[in-house]
């Protein structure tokens, strides 16, 4: 029998249409007949009771906003008749939650690259990283030259990562650029890196070299284009040296405890919090139980669900760091005259997400139910295993770049609307619905929509774990197959 709706939590006063439902449809919800007063698109909400004006709408067991007007049982609840409860800064109280997941440990491994410093990569690529946007054309030309010369053999990829920054920046923007580029150069998915500078930029190559700290000088080379005659010939000479090293690297067995994944969603819809995001949450809990690491970001998309994360902080210090994480981003919004609750995009709303709380309560499903063990500022690298929260905005390119830069080997990206992009680590797309997976097989890597078709979440997660291990061991995801790899750096200040 086809499932037509889902009431997510027993406390909810709305349900979600699994399929498009016509006006006049009769449904039995908790033993009570509900007659729909209007057409309800798939992924959208309908009222299970009569609402007075200003009454809270409950989904996932929490308020997602309040009604703007009186609504009747069977009415369509959407962004036109529900309003966010979010306002400015809040004071929070630590009410620690008990976490007892009881997930068995399995001795699972993947095939990765063990680096000289003991770290592990899931890819062995050669990267060309510009210190400043002025040399973007050069790094692109060098990457193409090495690909042509080697026919792309011997390493997983040869990529240049152009960006707009590295000069005409001050303060935090300049530091953010340096941090993200440093994190790239030191990332274990790179078997070798050529750093290309101009020579007169704010992000001075010599200072940036010191900023890197310890690095393998056999695997990281520098070229300052103003100091060489023919930058292409000099760059190719250095790349040949790097290729000779990287192309000899081989995969070895690595325990799953060394895997680090970023958790991301974009182009979300009303099914995100029902299928793909809970699937990631189940996987995240499993990975952490094996000793691994997952990272949740998109701080503005935590607004409205932040107390769930705060109360899962392992101690008071982490709770206070999480409060700062949330309120710093709220202050960033307010300092620019922007309301903290204006997040859902047109695509989100078309897909059934009405308010930021609606989005946040679905978004935070991605990190499961584990304790929070770490909180990271933007641009900083992981220090502890387990579940970490990372400061970065919701923008897909900026957030995914930040996840890669903190040390994640891959980004697990759920989507209900679809997106082709990838950051500089494998960016796996998990669809919330089967229609998207069928329509965009060149974008979607794994379909969580089968959960709506009565496949048990546990079975889907077993298949997902197997797929993650295959990808960590070298199987390419779609963004890699197509060469869709790019970076975006968070900018908050002026440009000179």
Predicted segments, located by residue:
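Metallocofactor- and cofactor-centric catalytic cores in central/energy metabolism, strongly enriched
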Residues: 1-410, 417-420, 425-496
């Amino acid at each position: 029998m086809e499932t037509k709706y889902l009431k997510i939590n027993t406390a909810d006063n709305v349900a979600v249409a699994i399929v498009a439902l016509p006006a006049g449809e009769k449904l039995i919800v908790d033993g009570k007949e509900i007659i729909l007063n209007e057409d309800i698109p798939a992924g959208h909400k309908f009222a299970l009771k009569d609402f007075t004006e200003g009454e809270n709408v409950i989904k996932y067991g929490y308020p997602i906003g309040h009604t703007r007007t009186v609504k009747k049982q069977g009415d369509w609840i959407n962004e036109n008749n529900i309003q966010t409860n979010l306002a400015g800064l809040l004071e929070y109280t630590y009410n620690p939650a008990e976490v007892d997941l009881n997930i068995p440990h399995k001795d699972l491994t993947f095939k990765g690259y063990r680096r000289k410093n003991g770290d592990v990569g899931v890819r062995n690529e050669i990267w060309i990283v510009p210190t400043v946007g002025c040399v973007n054309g050069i790094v692109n030309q060098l990457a193409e030259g090495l690909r042509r010369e080697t026919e792309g053999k011997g390493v997983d990829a040869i990529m240049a990562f152009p960006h707009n920054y590295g000069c005409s920046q001050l303060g935090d923007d300049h530091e953010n650029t340096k941090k993200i580029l440093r994190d790239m150069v030191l990332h274990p998915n790179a078997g070798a890196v050529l750093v290309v500078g101009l020579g007169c930029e704010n992000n001075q190559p010599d200072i940036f070299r010191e900023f890197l700290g310890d690095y393998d000088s056999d695997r990281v080379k520098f070229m300052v284009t103003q100091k060489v005659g023919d930058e292409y010939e000099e760059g190719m000479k250095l790349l040949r040296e790097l290729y000779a090293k990287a192309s000899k690297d081989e995969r070895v067995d690595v325990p799953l405890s060394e895997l680090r994944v970023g958790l991301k969603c974009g182009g979300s819809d009303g099914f995100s919090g029902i299928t793909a995001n809970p699937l990631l949450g189940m996987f995240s809990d499993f990975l952490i139980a094996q000793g691994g690491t997952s990272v949740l970001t998109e701080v503005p998309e935590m607004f409205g669900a932040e107390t769930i994360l705060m109360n899962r902080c392992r101690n008071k210090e982490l709770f206070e760091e999480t409060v700062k994480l949330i309120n710093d981003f709220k202050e960033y919004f307010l300092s620019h005259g922007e309301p903290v609750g204006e997040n859902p995009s047109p695509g989100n709303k078309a897909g059934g997400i009405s308010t930021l709380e609606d989005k946040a309560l679905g978004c935070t499903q991605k990190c499961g139910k584990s304790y929070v063990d770490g909180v990271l500022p933007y641009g900083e690298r992981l220090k502890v295993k387990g579940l970490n929260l990372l400061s970065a905005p919701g923008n897909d390119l900026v957030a995914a770049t930040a996840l890669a830069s903190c040390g994640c080997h891959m980004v697990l990206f759920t989507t209900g609307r679809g997106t082709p992009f990838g950051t500089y680590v494998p960016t796996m797309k998990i669809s919330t619905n089967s229609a998207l997976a069928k329509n965009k097989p060149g974008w979607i890597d794994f379909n969580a929509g089968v959960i709506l078709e009565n496949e048990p979440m546990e079975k889907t997660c077993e298949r997902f774990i197997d797929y993650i291990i295959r990808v960590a061991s070298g199987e390419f995801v779609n963004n890699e197959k197509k060469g869709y790899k790019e970076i975006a750096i968070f900018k908050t200040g002026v440009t000179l």
